[in-house]
């Protein structure tokens, strides 16, 4: 109770203000000054605060709308890219399969062409060997024949004398005469 009494005594000693003013010292302000300041702030600040909040709200909403549009556009681009990727993968698979089959076809063609070339080369080699063999045999025959003829001529020349020569001529003339007489 003593505290309450001191409060009233203390209020009685306050001097009266000569003019109206705002006390800027927060610890020394009274309830009326605080109410006036808060009321003025609410009255004048309400419109400004509302405008600021509305502007902020509009910016946030437009940012959200832009983000949604960008998201939709990005999703569309992503879907187009996925479709394009699938198409490219299908084409790549097709090219790969065609490439493999083309490689196999070319490999078979190359093997066939090489086989044919080898067969032709083998045939040509065999023909060449046959002709060379025939030529060599003909040369050997010719050489043997020449040597035989030379040997026979040598033998005849060494064995023939004039008397044998005349007898041979007479025998041949006799044979020719017999042939003529029969006609």
From Swiss-Prot:
GO terms for molecular function: ATP binding; proton-transporting ATP synthase activity, rotational mechanism. GO terms for cellular component: chloroplast thylakoid membrane; proton-transporting ATP synthase complex. It comes from the Eukaryota. Keywords: ATP synthesis, ATP-binding, CF(0), Chloroplast, Hydrogen ion transport, Ion transport, Membrane, Nucleotide-binding, Plastid, Thylakoid, Transmembrane, Transmembrane helix, Transport. It is a single-pass membrane protein. The gene is atpF. The keyword Nucleotide-binding applies. Belongs to the ATPase B chain family. The keyword Nucleotide-binding applies. Pfam families: ATP-synt_B. This is ATP synthase subunit b, chloroplastic. In plastids the F-type ATPase is also known as CF(1)CF(0). F(1)F(0) ATP synthase produces ATP from ADP in the presence of a proton or sodium gradient. F-type ATPases consist of two structural domains, F(1) containing the extramembraneous catalytic core and F(0) containing the membrane proton channel, linked together by a central stalk and a peripheral stalk. During catalysis, ATP synthesis in the catalytic domain of F(1) is coupled via a rotary mechanism of the central stalk subunits to proton translocation. Component of the F(0) channel, it forms part of the peripheral stalk, linking F(1) to F(0). InterPro entries: ATP_synth_b/b'su_bac/chlpt. The chain crosses the membrane at residues 25-45. It is found in: Plastid, Chloroplast thylakoid membrane. F-type ATPases have 2 components, F(1) - the catalytic core - and F(0) - the membrane proton channel. F(1) has five subunits: alpha(3), beta(3), gamma(1), delta(1), epsilon(1). F(0) has four main subunits: a(1), b(1), b'(1) and c(10-14). The alpha and beta chains form an alternating ring which encloses part of the gamma chain. F(1) is attached to F(0) by a central stalk formed by the gamma and epsilon chains, while a peripheral stalk is formed by the delta, b and b' chains.
């Amino acid at each position: 109770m003593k505290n309450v009494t001191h409060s009233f005594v203390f209020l009685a000693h306050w001097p009266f203000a000569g003019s109206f003013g705002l006390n800027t010292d927060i610890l020394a302000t009274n309830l009326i000054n605080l109410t006036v300041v808060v009321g003025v702030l609410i009255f004048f600040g309400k419109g400004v605060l509302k405008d600021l909040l509305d502007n902020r709200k509009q910016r946030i909403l437009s940012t959200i709308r832009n983000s949604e549009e960008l998201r939709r556009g990005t999703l569309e681009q992503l879907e187009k890219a996925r479709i394009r990727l699938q198409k490219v993968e299908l084409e790549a698979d097709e090219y790969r399969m065609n490439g493999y089959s083309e490689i196999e076809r070319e490999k078979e063609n190359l093997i066939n062409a090489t086989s044919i070339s080898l067969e032709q080369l083998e045939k040509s080699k065999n023909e060449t060997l046959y002709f060379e063999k025939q030529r060599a045999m003909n040369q050997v025959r010719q050489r043997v024949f020449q040597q035989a003829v030379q040997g026979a001529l040598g033998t005849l020349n060494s064995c023939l004398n004039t008397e044998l020569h005349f007898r041979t001529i007479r025998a041949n003339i006799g044979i020719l005469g017999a042939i003529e007489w029969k006609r």
